[in-house]
From Swiss-Prot:
Record-stated family: Belongs to the ClpX chaperone family.
Keyword ATP-binding in annotation: yes
ClpX-type ZB domain segment(s): 1-50
InterPro entries: AAA+_ATPase (IPR003593), ATP-dep_Clp_protease_ClpX (IPR050052), ATPase_AAA_core (IPR003959), Clp_ATPase_C (IPR019489), Clp_protease_ATP-bd_su_ClpX (IPR004487), ClpX_bact (IPR046425), P-loop_NTPase (IPR027417), Znf_CppX_C4 (IPR010603)
Protein name: ATP-dependent Clp protease ATP-binding subunit ClpX
Job description of the protein: ATP-dependent specificity component of the Clp protease. It directs the protease to specific substrates. Can perform chaperone functions in the absence of ClpP.
MF-aspect GO terms: ATP binding; ATP hydrolysis activity; ATP-dependent protein folding chaperone; protein dimerization activity; unfolded protein binding; zinc ion binding
Protein encoded by which gene: clpX
Keyword annotations of the record: ATP-binding, Chaperone, Metal-binding, Nucleotide-binding, Zinc
A single BP term in Gene Ontology: cell division
Entry binding sites for ATP: P130, T131, G132, S133, G134, K135, T136, L137
Stored NCBIfam families: clpX, PRK05342.1
Gene Ontology CC annotations of this record: HslUV protease complex
Residues binding Zn(2+): C8, C11, C31, C34
Length: 423
C-alpha cells in the first residue's frame, strides 16, 4: 500500500509538484508558491499608497478629483478682503499674512521659470499674540481662501524622535491625510503649529541635559520648515524596520507658527530701557509705555532668542507679525459681524426649528465683558454663549409653539430665562 502523499491545503498540489511544502499544526500544509502569493497580497496592500504616490509624482494618474494642478492666486488686497469676511480686527496681521502668502505661492508658480539665477526663498510666518486673538482662525481662513490642504499641530505634544510623544514628522502626516494622500497637493499646503512658544528651551545657555520637548523639537523642525525631503509612515506614529514610507518634499509647504509668548513683553521692555520700576524720569517712562500689544509690535528676532527659540529656527521664520489684544467693541463685532459668527450660527440652528433668535445689544455687551474678565479672548465668547443656549437648545426641538426667543442682559448676567414669544 503506497504512502499517502502530502498536499498543500490551499492549492491542492502534491509535494512532488511544488518546490517546498511547509507543515503546520496537524495535517495542514502550505507550499512555497502559496506563501509567495500571500506575501504578494500583503506587499501590494502595504505598497498601495506608495504606488499611488509615485503615479501622482510622475503625473500618470490621480484618484483625487479635488486636486487642481493650477493655483488660482489672489492679490494681497483680495486676500485681505476675504480675511475681513471671517476675522474681525487684526488689520496689520492680515496685511502681513496676505503679502507673505501671495509671495509664497507666486514663488511656487514661478519656480524654475526664470534663468537669471535668482532663487526665491520661502517666507514662513510667526504669529505673536495672546490667547484667543485669532492666530489659528487666520491660518485656517487663509487655507480655505486659497483652497489648499491645511493641518494644525500642537507643539506641546511634539518630542524628539525616539521619545514618548509625537514625532515632529507627524505634522506632515496630518497634512497628507488632510488631502487624501495626494502628495503633490500636500506639497503646496499650509501647516499651522500652535503653542509654538511652549517648545522654547528652558534657558539661553546650552544645556548639558537633553531637552526632548524643547530644543530637541526645535532642532527637528529646522529642516522640515526650511525645506527637505522627509520619509514619513502613511498612518503616522513611529517608524519601524521594513515599513514602507512616503516621501514628501517640504520646500513649498508654508509653515505658520503661533504662540502667546508670555514674558516676551518684559524682554522687549528691558531692551528698550523702559524699566518696570524706578523713580522720577523712569516712572514717567513707565506711564507712557503703552499697551502690551504696542510692545509686541517692537519685537525683534533677538527677543525671540532670549525667549528660548534657537537662532537657526528664528532665521527660518523671517515674517513676524503680532496680534492685538481684543477690546470690548471688537469682541462684540466678533459675535455678530463675520460670516460664520457664533450668533449667526445659533440663529441658523433656531431657524431650522422654525424659531427666530435675537440678542439684545445689552446682552452682547455683557457677553463681551464676561469674556474680557476670563482673559480668553474670542474663545471665551463661544463658551459663554454655549452655556447660555444649553437649556434653550435642549427644550426647543420638543416645543412647536415657540415663535421667537430673545436673549437679554438678564439672561447673561442673572441667569434668568430668555424672553419667549409663542405662536
Amino acid at each position: 500500500m503506497s504512502k499517502k502523499m502530502d498536499r498543500c491545503s490551499f492549492c491542492g498540489r502534491t509535494e512532488r509538484e511544488v518546490t517546498q511544502l511547509f507543515q503546520g499544526p496537524g495535517d495542514v500544509f502550505i507550499c512555497d508558491s502559496c506563501v509567495e502569493s500571500c506575501h504578494s497580497l500583503l506587499r501590494d496592500d502595504m505598497y498601495s499608497l506608495a504606488r499611488e504616490y509615485e503615479n501622482l509624482r510622475d503625473g500618470k494618474s490621480s484618484n483625487n478629483k479635488n486636486y487642481k494642478g493650477k493655483i488660482e492666486l489672489l492679490k494681497p488686497v483680495e486676500i485681505k478682503a476675504k480675511l475681513d469676511e471671517y476675522v474681525v480686527g487684526q488689520d496689520e496681521a492680515k496685511k502681513v499674512l496676505s503679502v507673505a502668502v501671495y509671495n509664497h505661492y507666486k514663488r511656487i508658480l514661478n519656480n524654475g521659470q526664470d534663468d537669471d539665477g535668482v532663487e526665491l526663498q520661502k517666507s514662513n510666518v510667526l504669529l505673536v499674540g495672546p490667547t484667543g486673538s485669532g492666530k489659528t482662525l487666520l491660518a485656517q481662513t487663509l487655507a480655505k481662501i486659497l483652497n489648499v490642504p491645511f493641518a494644525i499641530a500642537d507643539a506641546t505634544t511634539l518630542t524628539e524622535a525616539g521619545y514618548v510623544g509625537d514625532d515632529v514628522e507627524n505634522v506632515l502626516v496630518r497634512l497628507i491625510q488632510a488631502c487624501n494622500y495626494d502628495i503633490p497637493n500636500a506639497e503646496r499646503g499650509i501647516i499651522y503649529i500652535d503653542e509654538f512658544d511652549k517648545i522654547a528651551r528652558k534657558s539661553e545657555n546650552v544645556s548639558i541635559t537633553r531637552d526632548v520637548s524643547g530644543e530637541g523639537v526645535q532642532q527637528a523642525l529646522l529642516k522640515i520648515i526650511e525645506g527637505t525631503k522627509s520619509q514619513v509612515p502613511p498612518e503616522g506614529g513611529r517608524k519601524h524596520p521594513n515599513q514602507e514610507l512616503i516621501e514628501i518634499d517640504t520646500k513649498n509647504i508654508l509653515f505658520i507658527v503661533g504662540g502667546a509668548f508670555e514674558g516676551l513683553e518684559k524682554i522687549i521692555k528691558a531692551r528698550t530701557n523702559k524699566k518696570v520700576i524706578g523713580f522720577g524720569a523712569e516712572v514717567q517712562k513707565q506711564d507712557n509705555m503703552g499697551t502690551e500689544g504696542e510692545f509686541f509690535k517692537k519685537v525683534l528676532p533677538e527677543d525671540l532668542m532670549k525667549q528660548g527659540i534657537i537662532p537657526e529656527l528664528v532665521g527660518r521664520l523671517p515674517v513676524i507679525t503680532t496680534l492685538d489684544n481684543l477690546d470690548e467693541q471688537t469682541l462684540i463685532n466678533i459675535l455678530t459681524k463675520p460670516k460664520n459668527a457664533i450668533v449667526k450660527q445659533y440663529q441658523k440652528l433656531c431657524k431650522l426649528e422654525g424659531v427666530k433668535l435675537e440678542f439684545t445689544q445689552e446682552a452682547l455687551t455683557e457677553i463681551a465683558k464676561r469674556a474680557l474678565k476670563r482673559k480668553m479672548g474670542a474663545r471665551g465668547l463661544r463658551a459663554i454663549i454655549e452655556h447660555t443656549m444649553l437649556d434653550i437648545m435642549f427644550e426647543l426641538p420638543s416645543n412647536n409653539n415657540i415663535k421667537e426667543i430673545t436673549i437679554t442682559k438678564d439672561t447673561i448676567d442673572n441667569y434668568k430665562k430668555a424672553e419667549i414669544e409663542y405662536k
